[in-house]
C-alpha cells in the first residue's frame, strides 16, 4: 500500500526544506496549532502569541503569513523559536508532479486547530465568500469541517460596524460550524475613531486556544524564566514603529494588550517559561535570568498630598528595541490623556480649577493574570498610600485622622474644618468624613452618627455578601459592591467618585486550574492625573484580595468612566508623563494563605509583596479640593 501523501510530505526530500516535517510530528500525540496572521498592525503581536503557545505541554506550532502581514512580522523572530513560517510563495513552487506535496493541503492535514489572529476585514470577506487566492484562503477553503477554527478580527471601528462585516460574521459562522470568533475590543484608535475594532488581548487569545484544546502549561523551577535568543516579549523590530498606534484604515491595530512579561520572580512563585525550543531545532542561546529586585511596601519615601510631592527632571523616552518590553496596557491610559488634551471640552468644576473633559471614553482593561498588578510606571504611584486607603475602606473606617497618623494625607483636605463647614457639616469633628466608601461597603443603609460609633451588625455588609456569593454561587449576576447611596450623600464630606463594582467569575483557563475572577468598576468622576492611577491600583488590589480569599485567580480589571477630565493645573505635569515610555507592571504576591488570613478584614500591609516595581520618579500635581 502506498504511503499517504501527508506522510510522504513529512519524510520525502523536497526542494524547499522549510516544509519538511518529521514523521514523528504526525504520530507524536502532540497538539498541532497552525497560527495565521493577515494584513493588520495587530500582527506585531504574533510572536507573543506563538511564544505563549509554546509554553504549553506537547504543543507544536507552524505559522502562515499573508503578504501584507509580512510587513509587521519578522520571520527570523519566529524561526528562532523552532517554528516553520509559510507564505504565498511556498504553496505551489515545489509541485512538479502528482507525488509532490501541495502546501495548503498538507498544512491542513497537519493541523489540529487553526488560529487566525489578526483576521483583517479583507480576509474575513474572502473567507465569507469562498475566495482562495492565497495560501491562507486556500487552506481555509480546504479545511476539514470538524476541525476548530478560532478567529480574532481586528479592523477600524467603522469597518467593524459596517453591515457588510456583520453579514460576513454570520456567513462564516453558518458555513464553518466549528469556528469561533474572539471578538474585538473597544479602544481609542490611531485614526482618531473611538470604538470597537481592536484585536482582543493576545493573552486572552492564547487562553481561548488553551481552553479549546485543554492544554496544560509546562512547569519549571522558580527563577527559570528565560528568553529565547535573548529576546523579550516584544521581539519584532517593527513594534517600535507602531508603539502609539491602534489601527490602520484596512486592517486593525492592537494596543490594548500588555506586552510585558514577568521580569522578576518570587522565590515561592510557580511560574511558566516564556517559550521552549522544539526538539527538532538546534541548540539556541538562552539569556541569563533577570535579576530580581523588590520594592518593600514600607520603603515609600513619598509623603503624599495625593501621593505626588517630589519633582524630578523629565526622563527622555528611550526608543523600543526588539529586546525591550512594551506595556500597551499603560499606553491605554496615556493615549486617553492625549485624547482628552486634543478633544476635551473646557468646563468649570466644583473646585474652581477648571478642567478639560470628555464623557464616557472607551473602557480601560488591565490583565491581572500571572499575579500582575497594574501600577503605573510612567510616574511613581504611592503604593503604601493605595494599600492603606483600601484597607481603611475594607474596615468601614470613615475617620481621615487614622490615615493621617500613618502618613497618608490624601483625605486631609476633605476632612478639614473649612471644607466640612462648606458642606454644612459644622457639627462634625475634623477628619470625620461621614458615611463614605467604607461605610457603604460594610454598613449600607445604617443610620450614620459619627466616625466613633460602633456599627457592628448594622446595615448591609456588601463586601461580605460579595465574597460569600462568589464562593457559593459564583455565576450570580448580582455580585455588586455599591458606594452610591442617594439618601446618605448629604451627610458625606465628598460623594463617591468610584461608585459601583461588579464581579464576574469565568471558567479556569486550563483543566485543573482555578476559576478566574474579574471586576468592572464605574467611576462617575475620573481625575486622570491623580485619582485614576490610584483607582486602577486600588480596585486591582481588591480583586486580587477577593480572589485570594475565594481560592480563585485574578483575571482582569475593567475601568469604566463617566466625566473623564484633566485639571488645568495638571496639564504641564501630564505632558512630562507623556514623554515617558511605560515599563513592565510589577507582580503581587501574598505572604499568607487565605486560611491563615481568615477574613478580608484581617489583611494588613505586611501581607503584600510587590516585586519588580521600577517606575520613573514622582510627578508633582496639586489636589483640587
Curated annotation (Swiss-Prot):
Q: Which InterPro entries match?
A: Flavin_trans-like (IPR036551), Flavoprotein (IPR003382), Thymidate_synth/dCMP_Mease (IPR045097), Thymidate_synth/dCMP_Mease_dom (IPR023451), Thymidate_synth/dCMP_Mease_sf (IPR036926), Thymidylate_synthase (IPR000398), Thymidylate_synthase_AS (IPR020940)
Q: What is its EC number?
A: 2.1.1.45
Which keywords accompany this UniProt record?
A: Cytoplasm, Methyltransferase, Nucleotide biosynthesis, Transferase
Q: Which domain of life is it from?
A: Eukaryota
Q: What class of enzyme is it?
A: transferase
What pathway is this protein said to act in by its record? Pyrimidine metabolism; dTTP biosynthesis
Q: Where in the cell is it found?
A: Cytoplasm
The UniProt entry, under SUPFAM superfamilies, shows:
Homo-oligomeric flavin-containing Cys decarboxylases, HFCD, Thymidylate synthase/dCMP hydroxymethylase
Q: Record-annotated residues binding dUMP?
A: 350, 477-478, 524-527, 535, 565-567
Q: Catalytic positions?
A: 497
Annotated region (Disordered) at 224-323
Q: Where does (6R)-5,10-methylene-5,6,7,8-tetrahydrofolate bind?
A: 527
Q: Which GO terms describe its molecular function?
A: FMN binding; phosphopantothenoylcysteine decarboxylase activity; protein phosphatase inhibitor activity; thymidylate synthase activity
The UniProt record lists the keyword Zinc? no
Q: Which family does it belong to?
A: In the N-terminal section; belongs to the HFCD (homo-oligomeric flavin containing Cys decarboxylase) superfamily. In the C-terminal section; belongs to the thymidylate synthase family.
Query: Briefly, what is this protein's role?
Result: Required for both nuclear and mitochondrial DNA synthesis.
Q: Which protein, by its recorded name, is this? A: Probable thymidylate synthase
Taxonomic classification: Eukaryota, Fungi, Dikarya, Ascomycota, Taphrinomycotina
Amino acid at each position: 500500500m502506498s504511503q499517504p501523501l501527508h506522510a510522504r510530505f513529512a519524510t520525502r526530500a523536497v526542494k524547499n526544506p522549510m516544509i519538511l516535517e518529521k514523521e514523528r510530528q504526525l504520530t507524536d500525540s502532540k497538539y498541532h496549532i497552525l497560527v495565521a496572521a493577515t494584513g493588520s498592525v495587530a500582527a506585531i503581536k504574533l510572536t507573543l502569541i506563538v511564544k505563549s503557545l509554546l509554553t504549553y505541554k506537547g504543543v507544536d506550532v507552524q505559522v502562515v503569513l499573508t503578504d501584507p502581514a509580512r510587513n509587521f512580522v519578522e520571520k527570523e523572530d519566529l524561526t528562532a523559536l523552532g517554528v516553520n513560517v509559510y507564505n504565498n510563495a511556498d504553496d505551489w513552487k515545489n509541485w512538479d508532479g502528482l507525488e509532490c506535496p501541495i502546501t495548503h493541503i498538507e498544512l491542513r492535514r497537519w493541523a489540529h486547530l487553526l488560529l487566525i489572529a489578526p483576521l483583517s476585514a479583507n480576509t474575513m470577506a474572502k473567507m465569507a465568500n469562498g475566495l482562495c487566492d492565497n495560501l491562507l484562503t486556500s487552506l481555509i477553503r480546504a479545511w476539514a469541517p470538524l476541525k476548530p477554527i478560532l478567529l480574532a478580527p481586528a479592523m477600524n471601528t467603522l469597518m467593524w460596524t459596517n453591515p457588510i462585516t456583520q453579514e460576513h460574521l454570520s456567513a462564516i459562522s453558518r458555513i464553518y460550524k466549528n469556528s469561533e470568533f474572539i471578538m474585538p475590543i473597544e479602544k481609542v484608535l490611531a485614526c482618531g475613531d473611538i470604538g470597537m475594532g481592536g484585536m482582543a488581548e493576545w493573552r486572552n487569545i492564547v487562553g481561548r486556544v488553551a481552553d479549546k484544546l485543554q492544554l496544560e502549561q509546562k512547569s519549571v523551577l522558580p527563577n527559570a524564566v528565560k528568553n529565547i535568543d535573548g529576546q523579550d516579549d516584544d521581539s519584532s523590530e517593527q513594534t517600535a514603529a507602531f508603539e502609539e498606534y491602534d489601527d490602520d484604515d484596512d486592517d486593525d491595530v492592537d494596543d490594548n494588550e500588555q506586552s510585558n512579561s514577568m521580569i522578576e520572580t518570587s522565590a515561592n512563585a510557580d511560574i511558566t517559561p516564556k517559550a521552549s525550543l522544539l526538539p527538532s531545532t538546534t541548540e539556541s542561546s538562552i539569556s541569563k535570568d533577570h535579576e530580581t529586585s523588590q520594592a518593600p511596601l514600607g520603603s515609600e519615601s513619598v509623603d503624599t498630598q495625593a501621593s505626588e510631592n517630589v519633582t524630578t527632571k523629565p526622563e527622555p523616552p528611550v526608543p523600543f528595541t526588539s529586546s525591550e518590553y512594551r506595556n500597551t496596557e499603560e499606553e491605554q491610559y496615556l493615549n486617553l490623556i492625549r485624547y482628552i488634551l486634543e478633544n476635551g471640552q473646557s468646563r468649570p468644576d466644583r473646585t474652581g480649577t477648571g478642567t478639560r473633559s470628555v464623557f464616557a471614553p472607551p473602557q480601560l482593561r488591565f490583565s491581572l493574570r500571572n499575579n500582575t498588578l497594574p501600577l503605573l510606571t510612567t510616574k511613581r504611584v504611592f503604593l503604601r498610600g493605595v494599600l492603606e486607603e483600601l484597607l481603611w475602606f475594607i474596615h468601614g473606617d470613615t475617620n481621615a485622622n487614622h490615615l493621617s497618623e500613618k502618613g497618608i494625607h490624601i483625605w486631609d483636605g476633605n476632612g478639614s474644618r473649612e471644607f466640612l463647614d462648606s458642606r454644612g457639616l459644622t457639627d462634625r469633628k475634623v477628619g470625620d468624613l461621614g458615611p463614605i466608601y467604607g461605610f457603604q461597603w460594610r454598613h449600607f443603609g445604617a443610620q450614620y452618627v459619627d466616625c466613633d460609633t460602633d456599627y457592628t451588625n448594622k446595615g448591609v455588609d456588601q463586601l461580605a455578601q460579595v465574597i460569600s456569593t462568589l464562593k457559593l454561587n459564583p455565576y450570580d449576576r448580582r455580585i455588586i459592591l455599591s458606594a452610591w447611596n442617594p439618601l446618605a450623600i448629604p451627610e458625606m464630606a465628598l460623594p463617591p467618585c468610584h461608585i459601583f463594582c461588579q464581579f464576574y467569575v469565568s471558567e479556569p483557563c486550563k483543566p485543573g486550574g482555578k476559576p478566574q475572577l474579574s471586576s468592572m468598576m464605574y467611576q462617575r468622576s475620573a481625575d486622570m492625573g491623580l485619582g485614576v492611577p490610584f483607582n486602577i491600583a486600588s480596585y486591582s488590589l481588591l480583586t486580587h484580595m477577593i480572589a485570594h480569599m475565594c481560592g480563585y485567580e485574578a483575571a482582569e480589571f475593567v475601568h469604566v468612566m463617566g466625566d473623564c477630565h484633566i485639571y488645568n493645573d495638571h496639564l504641564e505635569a501630564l505632558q512630562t508623563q507623556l514623554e515617558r515610555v511605560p515599563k513592565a507592571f510589577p507582580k503581587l504576591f501574598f505572604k499568607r494563605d487565605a486560611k491563615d488570613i481568615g477574613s478580608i478584614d484581617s489583611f494588613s500591609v505586611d501581607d503584600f509583596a510587590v516585586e519588580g516595581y521600577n517606575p520613573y520618579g514622582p510627578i508633582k500635581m496639586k489636589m483640587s479640593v
